[in-house]
């Protein structure tokens, strides 16, 4: 069956996954990124002046969501999120990387900017 434009635009094509974060005493929901968000994140990570102190928090802010897939954190929350446990953020980051199919090659390309 060929899909129409309307079929494609109405498709619920985002995946979500619950991730247990022991450091925070519970779990969070994460989601796949939109093409727009993934592109913006990749562009940010290849910028000349990459801020490594907040990059994990920025990614986590993009993927942590409520049960309906609505993003919980805004850009304004990134600094506060960056103050949280590195182990907790790394756990969420790695789960998000897996869910969003960032390969090792993708990560090397991003890091190689």
Regions found by a protein language model. Give the residues of each.
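Short acidic-hydrophobic surface loop/beta-edge motif
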Residues: 15-23
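Extended acidic low-complexity intrinsically disordered regions
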Residues: 1-15
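Short, surface-exposed, charged amphipathic helix/loop patches that serve as local interaction elements
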Residues: 23-113
